[in-house]
């Protein structure tokens, strides 16, 4: 079974529902974990009782370290800050999960993500650089890596997850600075 985790608030609820639908259409055996960034999202997902989906209330995953930076970040920045922790939340909740893929809530799968995951082989994580077309090359200022689809294994990615978490706790803003932006 493939495990995916995402996070969104009620503004992105339609996107998250579309993500779930695309997984239902393309992936035989999966589970989608959703960190609910507001009570409206938590309530809606709980009431919908979608198969293969577990809503996770934000309050249950916020650590003291995360709460300490929450007030200094916009909602988007706080979501970015949570991203590297989201995989950890799934590993903590289910000790049988061997791999979790973080996926942005606005992703729509047209084919099975297992095709991409097979490329990973025995690697502990799969991190891909943005592939901006020449006419959009200036977007590199918004980050080097494509965060929208990032698989991590439980055992083989501990160090990279910890490093990313630490860096996002330290700095995760929508400010164009040399060599960093948001959760990059």
Task: State the predicted function of each range.
Residues 1-184:
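Glycosyltransferase catalytic domains, chiefly GT-A lineage
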């Amino acid at each position: 079974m493939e495990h995916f985790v995402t996070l969104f608030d009620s503004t992105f609820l339609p996107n998250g529902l579309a993500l779930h639908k695309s997984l239902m259409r393309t992936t035989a055996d999966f589970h989608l974990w959703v960190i609910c960034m507001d009570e409206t999202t938590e309530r809606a997902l709980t009431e919908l009782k979608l198969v293969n989906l577990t809503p996770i209330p934000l309050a249950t995953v916020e650590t003291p370290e995360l709460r300490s930076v929450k007030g200094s970040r916009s909602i988007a920045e706080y979501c970015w800050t949570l991203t590297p922790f989201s995989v950890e939340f799934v590993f903590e909740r289910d000790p049988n999960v061997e791999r979790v893929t973080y996926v942005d809530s606005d992703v729509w799968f047209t084919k099975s993500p297992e095709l991409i995951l097979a490329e990973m082989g025995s690697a502990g994580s799969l991190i891909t650089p943005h592939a901006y077309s020449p006419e959009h090359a200036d977007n590199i200022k918004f980050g080097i890596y494509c965060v929208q689809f990032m698989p991590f294994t439980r055992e083989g990615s501990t160090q990279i997850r910890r490093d990313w978490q630490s860096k996002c706790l330290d700095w995760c803003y929508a400010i164009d600075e040399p060599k960093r932006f948001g959760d990059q």
